[in-house]
Swiss-Prot record:
Mn(2+) 2 binds at D85, E88, E213. One of its GO terms (molecular function) is metal ion binding. Pathway: Carbohydrate biosynthesis; Calvin cycle. It is an enzyme of class 3 (hydrolase). Its cofactor is Mn(2+). This is D-fructose 1,6-bisphosphatase class 2/sedoheptulose 1,7-bisphosphatase. It catalyses: beta-D-fructose 1,6-bisphosphate + H2O = beta-D-fructose 6-phosphate + phosphate; D-sedoheptulose 1,7-bisphosphate + H2O = D-sedoheptulose 7-phosphate + phosphate. GO terms for cellular component: cytosol. NCBIfam families: glpX. Keywords: Calvin cycle, Carbohydrate metabolism, Hydrolase, Manganese, Metal-binding. Catalyzes the hydrolysis of fructose 1,6-bisphosphate (Fru 1,6-P2) and sedoheptulose 1,7-bisphosphate (Sed 1,7-P2) to fructose 6-phosphate and sedoheptulose 7-phosphate, respectively. Belongs to the FBPase class 2 family.
Length: 333
C-alpha cells in the first residue's frame, strides 16, 4: 500500500458520496444505496490492485455488486482487503438528515476481521482513555475513568448511543451518572470516529450496533490511536431486533462456529479487528455531519468533504475537493 493507492481510495468514497447525494431527501434509501454501490464498484475497478471485498453488501446471492468475496481492481498490483459501506446511514440520506457518509476501511490482504452480519457491542473513546476504559466495565465505571482521563467532570461528558429499545437501561444509567446522552437513529461509524478528535463534543460511544461497521470504526480508531473494543452479540433477545426473526441464539452460535469463530464471547480490540500492517480509513460526507460536510452541488462544480486516516504515515487528512464540471465558467472559493 502506498500514497498513490490511498489517493485512489479517497476518490472511491468521493464518487460513492456524490452518487448517493443526488438522491438526498427524496425518501429513496434503497436507490441511494444502489447508486453509491455502483459508483464505488466502478471506481474500484480502475485501481491497479488485487482487491477483495471482505465486508460488503451481503453474500454473493444477496448482492449484485460489492458482495463478500468479490474481487475488485485490475487484478494486478498489491493485495488489498476492503470493508465497505457505500452509503452508511441510508435513512439519513433518504430523509436529508445529518451523518450519512460513504465509508470504507482497507488493509493488506488478511488485515481485516471478516465480521459476520451480526450485532456488536461497542465501546469507543479518545486516545487518552485507550486501554483504561473497558467494555467489561459498567457504564458508570467507564464514565468515571473517562472523566479522569480527560480531566472533565462527568456532567461535561457526552455519550453517543443508538436510539434503540435495547439501550433503555444503558441510557438511564448514563444519565443517572450525570453525563449527557446524544441518541442517534443511524450511522454509528462517524460517532465512533468523532471520539478520536477533541472539539467534536463527542467523548464516548457505547452500545450495540452492526458488527461490519464495527470493523470500519476499529480501523479508523486504530489509525488514530483511539480506544475501540467490540464483542459480537448473537442472542436476539439482547439485540431486540426483528431482523433476526428466523434465527435463534443456538442457530446464531452454530453460524459463528461454521465461520470458524469458536470463542463466541471474545472481546476484540481495535488491532484485532484491523490487524494489517497498513490500515486506511476513508469517509466522504453525503450529508453534513460531525466530522465533515456533505456533498454540495453548484452550477459549475460539485464539492466533497472527506477524511482519510492512515497508519502508513500516521496522518488524518481532511480533504475538500472541487469536482469541476465540463464547460465550467466560474468556480467560487
Amino acid at each position: 500500500m502506498n500514497q498513490t493507492l490511498i489517493q485512489e481510495i479517497l476518490e472511491v468514497v468521493e464518487q460513492a458520496a456524490i452518487a448517493s447525494a443526488k438522491l438526498t431527501g427524496l425518501g429513496q434509501k434503497d436507490e441511494a444505496d444502489a447508486a453509491a454501490v455502483e459508483a464505488m464498484r466502478l471506481r474500484m475497478g480502475k485501481i491497479e490492485m488485487k482487491g477483495k471485498i471482505v465486508i460488503g453488501e451481503g453474500e454473493r446471492d444477496e448482492a449484485p455488486m460489492l458482495y463478500i468475496g468479490e474481487e475488485v481492481g485490475s487484478g494486478s498490483g498489491p493485495g488489498v482487503d476492503f470493508a465497505v459501506d457505500p452509503c452508511e446511514g441510508t435513512n439519513l440520506c433518504a430523509n436529508n438528515q445529518r451523518g450519512s457518509m460513504a465509508v470504507l476501511a482497507a488493509s493488506d490482504t488478511g488485515g481485516l476481521f471478516n465480521a459476520p452480519d451480526f450485532y456488536m457491542n461497542k465501546l469507543a473513546a479518545p486516545p487518552a482513555a485507550k486501554g483504561k476504559v473497558d467494555i467489561r466495565n459498567s457504564a458508570t465505571e467507564n464514565l468515571k475513568i473517562l472523566s479522569d482521563c480527560l480531566d472533565l467532570s462527568i456532567d461535561e461528558l457526552t455519550v453517543v448511543v443508538m436510539d434503540r429499545t435495547r439501550h433503555k437501561d444503558l441510557i438511564k444509567e448514563i444519565r443517572g451518572c450525570g453525563a449527557k446522552v446524544q441518541p442517534i437513529s443511524d450511522g454509528d461509524v462517524q460517532a465512533a470516529i468523532a471520539c478520536g478528535f477533541a472539539g467534536t463534543g463527542t467523548h464516548c460511544l457505547m452500545g450495540i450496533g452492526a458488527a461490519p461497521e464495527g470493523v470500519i470504526s476499529a480501523a479508523a480508531m486504530r489509525a488514530l490511536g483511539g480506544h475501540f473494543q467490540g464483542q459480537l452479540v448473537y442472542d436476539p433477545a439482547i439485540a431486540q431486533t426483528s431482523e433476526w426473526a428466523d434465527y435463534t441464539k443456538e442457530g446464531n452460535i452454530k453460524r459463528l462456529n461454521e465461520m470458524g469463530i469458536t470463542d463466541i464471547d471474545k472481546i476484540y480490540e481495535a488491532n484485532e479487528l484491523a490487524s494489517g500492517e497498513n490500515v486506511v480509513f476513508a469517509g466522504s460526507g453525503i450529508t453534513d455531519g460531525l466530522l465533515f460536510d456533505g456533498v454540495k452541488f453548484e452550477r459549475d462544480c460539485v464539492r466533497t468533504s472527506s477524511l482519510v486516516i492512515s497508519t502508513l504515515d500516521s496522518t488524518a487528512r481532511f480533504t475538500n475537493t472541487v469536482h469541476i464540471k465540463d464547460g465550467a465558467k466560474s468556480i467560487s472559493l
